[in-house]
Amino acid sequence: MQEYFEQCNREAKELAKILGFPVLVDEFETKEFEGCLIRHSSLIKPIIVANKVGKSTGRLNFTIAHEIGHGILKGHDRISEYVCNSSDICEDEFNTKINEKENEANRFAKNLLLPKKMFLKIIENLNFDYKNILKLKNKFNTSITLTAMRWVELSKDDIAIFYTIGENYKWWKGSETFFDKYNDKEPKSIIKVNNIYNAIENPSITIEDVYDSDEWFEEKTRYKFFIQSKCIYKNKVLSLIYIKEDL
């Protein structure tokens, strides 16, 4: 399937057409509705519908890939209609209330858009920073969040991402080696660092700085964190972290 996807310039909509799924992308009244896949006895193939209101190109691509998953994954044909809201189509993998079919479709979309072998080969000699995240986002037609998460998931370096709304911590994800250092530590519920404020005030640029680790986690300072923060939507900030040095 990756060969076909490359021929489609990594556009899930075009891949869906190759697979025989008609695709309707339109504006719907609610941002909560992301997409759906509809099966009916009158249809030769299921129809995919996607909502483009408030969606980046990368997010829309993920939504359509998710619906393709519902169309081809084993066991998904037992349900005639999948209506997926933003809580179902989850790039960040932190909604534990999602049912298994939605989780399977999310994993399918992630692996289709950012295949492990190809992505690993590209990132192995790159620095984990926004310059490269944005390049890869454009190359793979994905969102900033998904691209950063996949990098963290596959990396052997001490790296992590933090997602904040305003100054409030919402979730974080660390590489295996980073997580080993912090799996028993609680992130601070409110993160009062200039990076986040400056990123919100200056959404067009990436804010860089170095912080002691105790400004992010409830602990005595052990490491220096090199941080890049960027406002990805309104007051939502995604911060890239790697451990710069031991103290």
Located regions from the model:
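Active-site hotspot residues in diverse enzymes, especially metal/ion-binding acidic/histidine motifs
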Residues: 1-247
